[in-house]
Structure formats: structure tokens, C-alpha cells
Amino acid sequence: MRTGSALVAGGAVLAAGAPLVASLQPLRRALTPAVLPDRLSGVSTSRHIALTFDDGPDPGSTPGFLDLLAERDVRATFFLLGRYAVAEPALVRRMAEAGHEIGVHGWTHRCVVRLGPRRLADDLRATKRVIEELTERPTRWYRPPYGVLTTHALVAARSAGLSTVLWSAWGADWRRGRSAAQVVTTVTRGLRPGGTVLLHDTDRTSAPGSWRTTLTATERLLDAWAERDIAVGPLAEHWVG
């Protein structure tokens, strides 16, 4: 494995050519939040849960999530891919007008390891520009596809004025054959107070039709959190207070 310049983050060394693959759950359990900085792992000191969705916008599925969140009066953070945002301007505007926070997920869903530093930096700036032009609001967050971190990804995000944030619990909802109950169980098992949840509002990079399972699971999770009087919202509210 090649080595190169490295960034030491809370004890974790992220070397160029030696990416930290945060999407591998055993590794995440070992690193988050024990090793990764709280902000990077999406962990706050409050009981607030940050609800986040990746890979949209998708006109075939995202509206269902927006409708559900509107019914429950809940806002979330959506990490968008630039190629789809530019193709669905009305949907992006609807997200923003509903009070949801919008972050950068990249121009496409390519792993950052496959992009050179300059290409990645250009992609992030282009995606941020599209989102900000459509929403007329500043964009703050970046989440790399697959949760793969490299030093050049962190540097590119910072140069674009973005803060990188991962997640502390997920539903593995992109997998084929998952039930809503399984997604809920997986989220609940990994979630702690102050955590950030990762789900997907589209099946563009997931198993076909998986978004329907995620939508049902999201409804059940919102019900459970409401019963426990746990505040749920976007990352913008996660470190407030």
C-alpha cells in the first residue's frame, strides 16, 4: 500500500493512497466516535439525532420522503449528487423551501480514490455551485461516496468551503432483500444519543426498489423517536446549544 502525506485526525492517520473506508461497518465501530473527531463522525454531545439521506435527488422517490417529513414536521439533511441536482432543479428547490438542509455528495457517485485531487476539487466546487444557485443558500457539508476518506478529499472539501461529515449509524438500506424491520433494527443497534443516521432516498446506487423499504423504515423510526421525545433534525441543528 502506498503511503504519502497524512492527516492525523483524533488519532486516525489518513494517508494519501491509504484511504479510510468508513463504509465498512466493523471499521466504523472501531473508529467512530472513539478515534474520529466527533464532528467528522457526526456525533454531538446532545440527545439530538441528525437525520441524513444520500444519493438524490430522485423524482421517482425523493418526493415520498419529503411528504413524510412534512407530515411529521421534521427537517433533514440531504446529500445530493450534482449530476442529478442540475437535472432536477424544481425538486432541489422544493427541498430547500421545505426547510431541509442540502449538502454535497459529489458530482457523481465515484469513490474519491478513483478521482485525482484536481478532479475531485473541481467536482465539489461544481456541485456546491449548482446547489447554492438553485437554493440561494450557502452549502456547508460534504459527505464522500461510500464514506471513503483520503487526505486529498478532506483538503478538497475544505478548499471548497465544506466541512466533511460521515455518520454514526446506518440502516444498510441499499442492500437487496432488506425489510423495513431489518433497517430499523440496524439503525437502532448502532445509534447512540447525539448520533447521525445515514439512509438513502433513492435506489440509484442501491438495490432496485430499496427506497420503498427505506421510506417505511423512516416512518417507523420517526414514530419511535417521537414516542421517546427525541429531537430529530438536520446537521445544522446538531451542534447547537
Regions found by a protein language model. Name each.
Residues 26-113, 119, 123, 130, ...:
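Active-site beta->alpha N-cap acidic-glycine motif
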Residues 1-40:
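N-terminal membrane-anchoring alpha-helices
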Residues 54, 69, 78, 102, ...:
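Divalent metal-coordination and catalytic microenvironments
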Residues 110-115, 173-175, 204-208:
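A short acidic, helix-capping loop that chelates divalent metal ions and anchors anionic groups
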Residues 31-44, 86, 208-241:
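C-terminal domain-boundary segment and adjacent tail
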Residues 148, 154-191, 229-241:
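His/Asp/Glu-enriched short active-site or ligand-binding loop at hydrolase and phosphoryl-transfer sites
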Residues 114-149, 153-156:
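Hydrophobic, well-structured mid-protein blocks that either form specific transmembrane helices
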Residues 93, 120-124, 178-185, 211-218:
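Charged helix-capping and loop-helix junction motifs
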